A protein has these predicted regions:
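Two-component/phosphorelay signaling modules centered on CheY-like receiver
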Residues: 2-5, 14-32, 37, 151-169, ...
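Receiver (REC) domain active-site loop signature in two-component systems and cognate sites
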Residues: 57, 195
């Protein structure tokens, strides 16, 4: 990529835009907009690699803007910046906007700089990648691993796999999941946050680092904003869906995940637009490291 990465910052507060432009104008080509509608027009007219939007704006929420920007510029990496812990906004930004990161105000300058550098590196790789011919396995059935004992979830996933000719695998605890993930290629993961009394979040975060192509859909009755934000940033989950299952919404999420999985099959791994954040909490980081180690050791034993 010969020209600098272009970043569009959108916020209704001009002082915020000035601060962001001042911080990043030396590394990137920075453009700013205080009007989300005008921001959408610029995305249609100009090449933009990264968009960073505030959530609470008078004319349109940041989550809605990022969802609409996805339709206009699907390859643009999307980041939500907000001073409020809003579960519904986070869910909308993830499920409809496909956000790369969720950052909070006041932002940490180093965290913001690191996040933008990760996004810019992905954008640069995408821009410089040669066009490659499709390979024969692009339409091969997907492998789906279910980590959920709920009968309704199982019924919906079984119907989806039967309709699409996909392969369904199940695990009933973390140990079974680790064995399956080492034995079998997995494209889609459907998981509750609790399985057999065990917390599945560390596994999801480990897989984001070990298997970037794997798409995770979380289906859970829990409504914890902070937990969701960590899953967005540290596990790069694809969807966050509520229980009890809303069949239409769940089926829509599965279909979108399958379409994304087929798309990513056609790309080299370094062009998959994912870069999971390392867990900030020491205990969680240790658990993730332990699972990554178990994945590696299992793989080594199976190869030997």
């Amino acid at each position: 990529m010969t020209s600098p990465v272009r970043i569009l910052f959108v916020d209704d507060e001009e002082r915020i835009l000035r601060s962001l432009a001042l911080q990043f104008r030396r590394q990137y080509e920075v453009i700013t907009e205080s009007d989300p509608l005008r921001a959408l027009e610029r995305l249609k007219e100009e090449s933009v690699q990264i968009i960073v939007s505030d959530q609470r704006m008078p004319r349109m929420s940041g989550a809605e803007l990022l969802a609409r920007s996805r339709e206009v510029a699907p390859e643009c990496l999307r980041i939500l910046l907000t001073g409020y812990s809003d579960l519904d906004a986070a869910v909308e930004a993830l499920n409809n906007g496909g956000i790369f990161r969720y950052l909070t105000k006041p932002w940490d300058p180093q965290e913001m700089a690191f996040t933008l550098r990760q996004a810019a590196e992905i954008a640069e790789r995408q821009a410089s990648a040669p066009v490659t011919a499709a390979t024969s396995d692009l339409a091969a059935p997907l492998n789906l691993l279910l980590l959920d004992d709920d009968p309704e979830t199982l019924h919906c996933v079984e119907a989806f796999c039967q309709a699409g000719g996909h392969r369904l695998m199940r695990a009933h605890n973390l140990s079974e999941a680790l064995v399956t993930l080492n034995l079998e290629p997995v494209d889609l993961l459907v998981s509750d946050l609790k399985l057999g009394g065990e917390d599945m979040a560390p596994l999801l975060k480990s897989l984001a680092q070990a298997h970037p192509r794997l798409l995770s859909l979380v289906v859970t009755p829990f409504r914890d904003t902070q937990a969701l934000l960590k899953l967005i940033n540290e596990a790069q989950i694809f969807r966050y869906l509520p229980k009890p299952i809303r069949r239409g919404l769940f089926e829509k999420g599965l279909k979108a995940a399958a379409e994304q999985a087929f798309l990513w099959r056609s790309r080299p791994l370094d062009l998959v637009p994912r870069a999971a954040e390392v867990p900030k909490e020491a205990g969680e980081n240790q658990r993730v490291g332990s699972i990554l180690g178990m994945l590696a050791r299992l793989r080594e034993r199976m190869i030997a």
